[in-house]
């Protein structure tokens, strides 16, 4: 099952964001939950869903390890965009890309497979950051054999 309910603790965060929106309504500010916060939520949720052992922050492109020992990179969005990548010395064996619908407190596993499959859509080398489109990451997921996916534990 690709779609899942976000943990109840996320409700408090979304409600606080909504209160900010209401309070500053005349300023037309979005108070978008994005960046590092969404990335951290993605890692925490992925750890719960797949039994990942998260690694200390080390900037290597590896966020944790799956129960079978595979290294895992977790990417997440709450803004309806595809995943962004940087050039790193060490690539993870596996990639999980999660998309959050915070207004409805739902999440979707968009990509669950070897990271190299997703990276085929990017040039072999680049400077800075490069992103896949939503279409590209979904297409990459169709190329993953079922036995190459991580199994959910929850």
What are the functions of these language-model segments?
Residues 1-154:
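Nucleic-acid endonuclease domains
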């Amino acid at each position: 099952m690709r779609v899942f309910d976000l943990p109840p603790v996320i409700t408090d965060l979304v409600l606080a964001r909504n209160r900010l929106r209401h309070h500053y309504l005349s300023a037309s500010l979005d108070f978008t939950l994005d960046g590092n916060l969404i990335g951290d939520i993605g890692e925490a949720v992925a750890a719960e869903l797949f039994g990942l052992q998260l690694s200390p922050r080390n900037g290597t492109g590896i966020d944790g390890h799956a129960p079978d020992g595979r290294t895992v990179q977790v990417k997440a969005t709450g803004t309806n965009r595809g995943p962004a990548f940087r050039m790193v010395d060490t690539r993870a064996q596996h990639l999980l890309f999660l998309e959050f619908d915070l207004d409805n407190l739902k999440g979707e596993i968009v990509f669950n497979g070897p990271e190299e499959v997703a990276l085929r859509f990017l040039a072999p080398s680049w400077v800075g950051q490069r992103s896949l489109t939503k279409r590209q990451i979904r297409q990459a997921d169709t190329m993953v054999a079922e036995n190459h996916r991580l199994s959910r534990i929850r």
